[in-house]
């Protein structure tokens, strides 16, 4: 792990496309701004962990549940086309 020391107003570059801005340091809190391409996900770590857990849960969902949901969508689409 690379550890850097920065003061308020200074920046850190990650690759060619990502820049971290140290906006404010107040006590034990640091406000950071992130400039990144639109396609790059930027999340607080605890939010990222929840997203990963939800993705794993969805990927391991019971096949019968998925088939039932697909059947409901088919029924809804048939009603719309009538």
From Swiss-Prot:
One of its GO terms (biological process) is bacterial-type flagellum organization. Keywords: Bacterial flagellum biogenesis, Cytoplasm, Repressor, RNA-binding, Translation regulation. One of its GO terms (molecular function) is mRNA 5'-UTR binding. It is found in: Cytoplasm. Its main location: cytoplasm. GO terms for cellular component: cytosol. Coiled coil: none annotated. It comes from the Bacteria. A translational regulator that binds mRNA to regulate translation initiation and/or mRNA stability. Usually binds in the 5'-UTR at or near the Shine-Dalgarno sequence preventing ribosome-binding, thus repressing translation. Its main target seems to be the major flagellin gene, while its function is anatagonized by FliW. Homodimer; the beta-strands of each monomer intercalate to form a hydrophobic core, while the alpha-helices form wings that extend away from the core. Belongs to the CsrA/RsmA family. PANTHER family: CARBON STORAGE REGULATOR. NCBIfam families: csrA, PRK01712.1. This is Translational regulator CsrA. The lineage of its organism: Bacteria, Pseudomonadati, Thermodesulfobacteriota, Desulfobacteria, Desulfobacterales.
